[in-house]
Curated annotation (Swiss-Prot):
This is GDT1-like protein 1, chloroplastic. Residues 1-41, 54-76 are annotated as: Disordered. It comes from Oryza sativa subsp. japonica. GO terms for biological process: calcium ion transmembrane transport; Golgi calcium ion homeostasis; Golgi calcium ion transport; manganese ion transmembrane transport. Belongs to the GDT1 family. Keywords: Chloroplast, Membrane, Plastid, Transit peptide, Transmembrane, Transmembrane helix. It is a multi-pass membrane protein. Residues 1-57 form a transit peptide. Its main location: plastid. The chain crosses the membrane at residues 79-99, 117-137, 158-178, 203-223, 246-266, 286-306, 318-338. One of its GO terms (cellular component) is Golgi apparatus. One of its GO terms (molecular function) is manganese ion transmembrane transporter activity. It holds the Pfam family GDT1. PANTHER family: PROTEIN PAM71, CHLOROPLASTIC (PTHR12608:SF6), TRANSMEMBRANE PROTEIN HTP-1 RELATED (PTHR12608).
Length: 341
């Protein structure tokens, strides 16, 4: 009986193994600590009364200050590397601000320099319209117009158009460059009148436009066609010399080159040459170039397709009156701009 009781007591002291698995132990709760301050430029600035720029991690629990120079593990402070990081952030921010300021200053300087060359970009449409109307009505019935018409009657119209328009395009670019150079020199050496800067280039351009406007209207009001006949006779003489040389009509390239030289010489110092200089000095050169090229292209195309038919649809006097009126109108606009400025 005693043996049975002892065995029972020994069995009851043994651990009982259950079939179910035991849940994992709950980890101990870590006390909540204060959030690290952000590494912004403002947080890097030293506070009043602080001697060292060291960012520490605060604890919810009160206690003695934690030693510096320890790691993240046991609630320890960040090393002094944060001070150098803040210094780099400040230096980077200052560098970015200085770079932006220098770029803006450089862009402003380059824009002012380009504006002296290309003029006011907002005045392109006005310069285009003025140059187109002025060149178109100036070239109708001009010596260059008759030269293109006479050459097209004896050669291919496309070849004559290329040679004529090429010469007029080069002449236009030269005129605009001269006008813009005069405007640039006037900006460097200003002329003072009454205590204010007086735009000499715009004034001379207006005077030149007035001169051509008055002479064109006087030729139209004279009642005879001597001026137009003189232009046509000069064109016929130039074309006869061109054809008499025999240089040229051998190939398309030689014909284009000969036409280019003939028109370039005839156009040099012409009324449209000086009027383009005047417009470029007072208006946007980009608009003047585009408008002049468009006006030359349309007038040359009319001359090549059938310049002799122009008189059946449009009177020579009407063309002269329109051209002279445009010269005076553009001169008046230039003078008004001078007064307003």
């Amino acid at each position: 009986m005693a043996s049975v009781a002892s065995s029972t007591v020994f069995a009851s002291s043994l651990p009982h193994h259950r079939a179910t698995t035991r849940a994992p132990p709950t980890p101990p709760r870590i006390p909540r600590r204060a959030r690290l301050p952000g590494r912004s430029v403002v947080s890097c600035l030293p506070k009043r009364g602080s001697e060292k720029l060291v960012v520490t991690r605060a604890s919810d629990e009160e206690g003695p200050p934690e030693p510096a120079g320890q790691g993240r593990g046991g609630g320890r402070a960040w090393p002094s590397l944060d001070a150098s990081s803040c210094g780099l952030a400040l230096a980077a921010a200052a560098g970015v601000l200085m770079l932006q300021g220098s770029q803006q200053a450089l862009a402003g300087t380059e824009f002012m320099g380009m504006q002296d060359v290309v003029g006011d970009l907002g005045d392109i449409s006005t310069g285009f319209a003025s140059a187109f109307l002025l060149i178109f009505f100036s070239e109708l019935g001009d010596r260059t117009f008759f030269i293109a018409a006479l050459l097209a009657a004896r050669n291919s119209g496309a070849i004559i158009f290329l040679g004529t328009f090429g010469a007029l395009a080069v002449m236009t670019i030269i005129s605009v460059v001269l006008g813009r150079a005069f405007h640039y020199v006037d900006g460097i050496i200003p002329f003072s009148f009454g205590g204010t800067d007086f735009p000499v280039d715009d004034f001379l351009a207006a005077c030149l436009l007035v001169y051509y406007g008055i002479t064109t209207l006087l030729d139209a009001a004279s009642g005879d066609e001597e001026k137009m006949n003189e232009e046509q006779e000069e064109a016929e003489l130039a074309v006869s010399k061109f054809l008499g040389n025999g240089a040229g009509i051998i190939s398309a390239a030689s014909t284009i080159a000969s036409t280019f030289v003939l028109v370039f010489i005839a156009e040099w110092g012409d009324k449209s040459f000086f009027s383009t200089i005047a417009l470029a000095a007072a208006s946007s050169p980009l608009g003047v170039i585009a408008g002049s090229l468009a006006g030359h292209a349309v007038a040359t195309l009319i001359a090549v397709l059938g310049g002799s038919l122009l008189g059946t649809f449009l009177s020579e006097k009407i063309v002269a009156y329109i051209g002279g009126s445009l010269f005076l109108a553009f001169a008046a606009v230039t003078l008004v701009e001078i007064v307003n400025s």
